[in-house]
């Protein structure tokens, strides 16, 4: 084989290489070409260090060309602790970002249950996993004590950050191109405050004649907090209800019910780690805990609450006169069940019996607590 043939074979072998294949079984792994783009753009952003002149809450917006969704992009690093570009996609993620930026109490479970997007974080070798190091070494990164390098992650509601698929990586490539163009523009224009007006942000639009995505037009757009989507009552699982109705159980007392995600991880070594999700019910008078209902990230909140309540009624041998919940959303989700069985649902700020159980459970599973405590 000639040298040119050998070089060509080596190049083809590289091009066919994939990253994160074991960790993304059943999904499209990261291609060599896209991984190379991520690495080069990530290293460029690390050199620019945008956190030196951008605050964590200085969002810029872009539109995903495939889905049409808005990407809300934020650089982190002004505090000198975490250095990253975070890209939040969709209205729910944006709404939750604003909640964090406003300093409202936010648990780890709340964060992971709501956020969807992609990120590049710049970490030292101690924080890099073997799959991360495999990618970095493939593009010539030399490991050095204390030296930071980019790692690439995706956030999906109900899951911990995990390795990016090919599709998720392309969104991140696009947003990296956008912030690098924005940084070049900011360096040329000097001290311009794009965020001086409330709810107004720079929106980056690729110039039509530029196929490289290196040049963007900057438009200022108003992006107020989107309204919360109205919940709808869940369809009833008649097979579960039939186990309650014919028994003519006595009606008495109150039950306290809640649903939440925790920061505890569930999953095998090379699996995307789900957050432990649970619906809990306790007797509002005695504080007795009933069997909790565990759920997957994709499960319906209303169904989890309904199953937990029906299980409590079966085990407790009574139908409550009242069910107390913390959120108006839960009252709506349970409206069909409450009408069918005949109990009231009341929204209250405090669930003393259940909160005691919840705090004990979170401590037992090692939940990290509120984001401000991390």
PLM feature spans:
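Secondary-structure boundary/capping micro-motif
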Residues: 2-279, 284-374
């Amino acid at each position: 084989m000639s040298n040119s043939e050998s070089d060509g074979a080596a190049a083809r072998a590289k091009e066919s290489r994939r990253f994160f294949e074991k960790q993304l079984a059943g999904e499209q792994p990261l291609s060599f070409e896209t991984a190379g783009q991520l690495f080069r753009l990530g290293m460029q952003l690390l050199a620019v260090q945008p956190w030196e002149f951008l605050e964590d809450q200085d969002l810029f917006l872009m539109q995903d060309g495939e889905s049409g969704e808005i990407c809300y992009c934020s650089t982190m690093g002004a505090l000198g602790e975490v250095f990253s570009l975070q890209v939040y996609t969709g209205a729910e993620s944006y709404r939750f970002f604003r909640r964090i930026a406003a300093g409202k109490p936010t648990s780890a479970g709340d964060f992971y249950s709501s956020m969807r997007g992609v990120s590049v974080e710049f970490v030292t070798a101690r924080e890099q996993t073997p799959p991360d190091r495999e990618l970095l070494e493939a593009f010539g990164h030399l490991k050095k004590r204390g030296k930071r390098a980019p790692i690439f992650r995706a956030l999906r509601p109900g899951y911990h950050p995990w390795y990016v698929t090919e599709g998720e990586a392309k969104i991140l490539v696009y947003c990296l191109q956008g912030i690098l163009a924005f940084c070049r523009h900011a360096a040329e224009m000097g001290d311009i405050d794009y965020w001086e007006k409330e709810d107004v942000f720079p929106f980056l639009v690729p110039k039509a004649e530029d196929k490289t995505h290196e040049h963007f037009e900057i438009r200022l757009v108003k992006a107020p907090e989107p309204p919360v989507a109205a919940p709808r009552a869940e369809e009833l699982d008649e097979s579960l209800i039939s186990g309650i109705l014919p028994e003519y159980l006595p009606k008495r007392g109150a039950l306290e019910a809640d649903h939440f995600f925790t920061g505890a991880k569930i999953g095998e070594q090379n699996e995307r780690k789900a957050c432990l999700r649970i619906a809990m019910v306790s007797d509002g008078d005695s504080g007795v805990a009933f069997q909790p209902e565990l759920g997957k990230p994709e499960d319906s909140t209303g169904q989890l609450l309904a199953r937990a309540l029906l299980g409590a009624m079966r085990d407790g041998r009574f139908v409550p006169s009242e069910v107390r919940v913390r959120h108006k959303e839960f009252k709506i989700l349970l409206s069909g069940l409450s009408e069918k069985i005949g109990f009231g649902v009341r929204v209250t700020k405090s669930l003393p019996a259940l909160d005691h159980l919840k705090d004990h459970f979170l401590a037992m599973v090692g939940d990290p607590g509120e984001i401000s405590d991390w």
